[in-house]
């Protein structure tokens, strides 16, 4: 029967994140710090806009690239927030989540055998999407003492004549690291020197806590070689709506649109109307959620260090990535035993690549009370196992 399956699909492993999430779902009393999803409900005015669109009969296809009014609003949003200039006519595309935007971006540019350089630890989908396109993921190892960030020198060491693109996630999933403008400037010079495309996963851009977020596409000479990937799931608490977008020069955007129109036709209309309302009237809610995440981060990361799990300071997203190297066990074993003994679900760092071994990913996108109870259980687990 395996002869029926694509070689590309057979070489891909199931998501390690879902494995622990699914296991936790079978147990009672579990505090999940596993899946990266806001604990907030989508703002009422955003939900109401979607309901109103249905009541008014907007149930048909939209343009392949998305509602023009939404693309106009995305264009204004990118300009006002991140100093990015993209035309709603031919440089923006609304997608079914940021993951689909990344998928079609990779498929639009990567030929079989071409390489995409990816700093790790990295989000589990990156390798799979590159491999499904026939490409080869090439990893750059990063470490906690350097903030889990790759440098231009790291990319120089990994580049070959087959390199087509580099993929940067800032703020990072799973580490929460944020690239500074100075660091991005150096990486931009590398990209221009070697004429490679930059895939910029900026889904967590709004959730940057300590410094102003910089998009690499805003740097001189970078818009024409960058695809910005973003969406509404994280900052707007709209994970279930599955709505994202990509911003790219028209040549790349049009190539992505070819794939999108055959695979998806368009993103769901009711979700697009919801996102439109979010951009127009939902930024105060985004800011409130951001402030809450910042408070949780400060509490959680400080407490992790106090109980003996060394954790670098994450500048964005809603993840902590503490070291468990002192425990004398693998990250997968640690996660399994913490779940079975104390009913706290975390994700082993190893699922994010070899650089993640010896760490665990903890999402602090849950209530302060849940975080405090999780810390009590984790501290008890550490005392029992050391």
Swiss-Prot record:
This is Putative aminotransferase YugH. The lineage of its organism: Bacteria, Bacillati, Bacillota, Bacilli, Bacillales. It comes from Bacillus subtilis (strain 168). One of its GO terms (cellular component) is cytoplasm. Signal peptide: none annotated. Its cofactor is pyridoxal 5'-phosphate. Belongs to the class-I pyridoxal-phosphate-dependent aminotransferase family. The keyword Amino-acid biosynthesis applies. SUPFAM superfamilies: PLP-dependent transferases. Keywords: Amino-acid biosynthesis, Aminotransferase, Cytoplasm, Pyridoxal phosphate, Transferase. It is an enzyme of class 2 (transferase). It is found in: Cytoplasm. Pfam families: Aminotran_1_2 (PF00155). The keyword Translocase does not apply. GO terms for molecular function: pyridoxal phosphate binding; transaminase activity. It comes from the Bacteria. Its main location: cytoplasm. The modification N6-(pyridoxal phosphate)lysine is found at residue 234. Its EC number is 2.6.1.-. GO terms for biological process: amino acid biosynthetic process; amino acid metabolic process.
């Amino acid at each position: 029967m395996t002869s029926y399956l694509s070689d590309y699909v057979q070489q891909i492993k199931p998501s390690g994140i879902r494995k622990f999430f699914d296991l936790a779902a079978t147990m009672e009393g579990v505090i999940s710090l596993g899946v990266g999803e806001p604990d907030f409900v989508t703002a009422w005015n955003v939900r109401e806009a979607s309901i109103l669109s249905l009541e008014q009969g907007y149930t048909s296809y939209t343009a392949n690239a998305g509602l023009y009014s939404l693309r106009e609003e995305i264009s204004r949003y990118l300009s006002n927030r991140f100093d990015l200039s993209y035309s709603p006519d031919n440089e923006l595309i609304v997608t079914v989540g940021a993951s689909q935007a990344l998928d079609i971006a990779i498929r639009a540019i990567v030929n079989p055998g071409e390489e995409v350089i990816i700093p790790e630890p990295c989000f589990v989908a990156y390798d799979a999407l590159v491999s499904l396109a026939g490409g080869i993921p090439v990893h750059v190892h990063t470490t906690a003492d350097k903030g889990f960030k790759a440098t231009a020198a790291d990319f120089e060491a990994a580049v070959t004549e087959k390199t087509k693109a580099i993929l940067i996630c800032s703020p990072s999933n799973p580490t929460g690291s944020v690239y500074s403008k100075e660091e991005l400037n150096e990486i931009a010079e590398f990209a221009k020197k070697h004429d490679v495309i930059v895939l910029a996963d900026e889904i967590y851009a709004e959730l940057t806590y300590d410094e102003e977020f910089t998009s690499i596409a805003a740097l001189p000479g970078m818009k024409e070689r960058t695809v910005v990937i973003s969406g509404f799931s994280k900052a707007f608490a709209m994970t279930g709506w599955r709505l994202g977008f990509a911003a790219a020069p028209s040549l790349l955007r049009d190539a992505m649109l070819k794939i999108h129109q055959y695979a998806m036709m368009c993103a769901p209309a009711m979700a697009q109307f919801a996102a439109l309302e979010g951009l127009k009237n939902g930024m105060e809610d985004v800011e409130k959620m951001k402030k809450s995440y910042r408070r949780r981060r400060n509490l959680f990361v400080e407490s992790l260090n106090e109980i003996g799990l060394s954790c670098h300071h994450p500048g964005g997203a809603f993840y902590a990535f503490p070291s468990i190297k002192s425990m004398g066990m693998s990250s997968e074993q640690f996660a399994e035993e913490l779940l079975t003994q104390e009913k706290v679900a975390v994700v082993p760092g190893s699922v994010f690549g070899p650089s993640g071994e010896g760490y665990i990913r903890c999402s602090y996108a849950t209530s302060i009370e849940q975080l405090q109870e999780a810390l009590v259980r984790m501290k008890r687990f550490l005392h029992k196992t050391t």
